[in-house]
Amino acid sequence: MLFSQIVATSRDVGATRSRKVKVATLREALTRLEQAEVEPVVAWLSGELRQGRIGIGWRTVADIPATPADVAAVTVSEVDGTISAVAEVSGSGSAARRRELLADLFARTTADERDFLLRLLTGDLRQGALEGVMTDAIAAAADLPIEPVRRAFMLSGRLPATAVAAFDGGVDALTAFRLEVGRPVRPMLASPAESLADAWSELGGDVSVEYKLDGARIQVHRNGDEVRIFTRTLREITGSVPELVALVARLPCTSAVFDGETLALTDSGRPRPFQETMSRFGAESARDLLLHPYFFDCLHLDGVDLLDSPLEERLKALERVAPQHRIPGLIRPDSEGAATHFDDALAAGHEGVMVKSLTAPYAAGRRGRAWQKVKPEHTLDLVVLGAEWGYGRRTGYLSNLHLGARDPDGGAPIMVGKTFKGLTDALLQWQTDEFPRHERARDDHTVYLHPDLVVEIELDGVQVSTRYPGGLALRFARVLRYRPDKTAADADTIDAVRSLLPG
């Protein structure tokens, strides 16, 4: 297939807000691929390279001289082959050799193809083909039910591998995917609840009520003497957290996969600010700040996969090997006990509680109602779409944030409000320094950003409004913190915002 056809597909997907049209457009492209083209094309249309990170940034590619070709003639295989060659370059003179390979490729591409390549190589490709949309398209193109495709993706963590299995082996190949110790699975996610009473009413009394910590999500894998630790985005941080590795290596088991949180504590045992915990992920300078693990789930133990087991069984497995490292929680408390546990969590400096169905399996990568988070105030994780230059004491700083919710159908984030409340002097300075790195456009008053940054917003509620495209507006929104552990795909959807409407 010609590379230009993939570029056209990307353009068409990005030009529509309709999930149905996105899926149909992707399905049509996928059905025309040769077997060897499936893996790279699915990766590209998901905004990534099948080779992973290859050490290419804007400095490498932006000034490569090349006159665009008049006719589109480069094939998918040629582009993928060049990227593989670039990825394999190492040693002395590697930068020059990478530029040479890319210059040769760029000289054979049209202007549209080069623009797509530049954005793909530098991680700046955004065409609206989010993972859920691509998963649907793979199922449709392979003429398979969606559930085995979705499950295979959640267990493999990679859409290209899932697509290859779907096209080559159908349902049998997809169901062959299993939890593999050492390979992270996508984490199960929680939905916000209006109140403890609402969560209790929806899930009934057959629940676990646990502290919701103000920490960083971790997934811990142990296979014999080897321990590997991953973030919620599946990035490995094993080398940055030796104290967690040592602790898990001492647990009385031979193989395990735990889900949990980690955080730094003060001398009095209260949680330190979230940013201090995050500073440990890759920061040598923060090694004197010890992290503590708090596990709340066990997905595998000593050769037995537990993903499909009810939460109650998974908690029993966790209790057998790591009772002293479990997040504080109650099993089947009465309503009074649950309320007391909620108050205790707040008094200890934590965010609130999680209410979880004891009968639910671990739905990797899914945000459902089996887990519900309860906080004293409403909070949303939103995408920063832009920022306005301040005035008065904020003159010279990027201040008033434009906030967007995720479109569940894969379109661009939907603006739902603005705020400058809660911004400290340090945050104002950080925004002013950082935002230009994510800039897509600007005018005299505003710098508009690519949807890269996620910020946690506290708000009093939501109201109907015609001021913003989503038909909603945030009430008394204020910035709590930025979430470097989350991507735009982790932001709350417009449906989550709408669920906070009164009545």
Swiss-Prot record:
Signal peptide: none
Named cofactor requirement(s): Mg(2+)
Positions contributing to ATP binding: E210, R217, R232, E261, F296, R367, K373
Entry keyword set: ATP-binding, Cell cycle, Cell division, DNA damage, DNA recombination, DNA repair, DNA replication, Ligase, Magnesium, Metal-binding, Nucleotide-binding
Catalytic activity entry: ATP + (deoxyribonucleotide)n-3'-hydroxyl + 5'-phospho-(deoxyribonucleotide)m = (deoxyribonucleotide)n+m + AMP + diphosphate
SUPFAM superfamilies (UniProt xref): ATP-dependent DNA ligase DNA-binding domain, DNA ligase/mRNA capping enzyme, catalytic domain, Nucleic acid-binding proteins
Active site, per annotation: K212
Described purpose of this protein according to its UniProt entry: DNA ligase that seals nicks in double-stranded DNA during DNA replication, DNA recombination and DNA repair.
Name the UniProt record assigns to this protein: Probable DNA ligase
Protein species of origin: Rhodococcus opacus (strain B4)
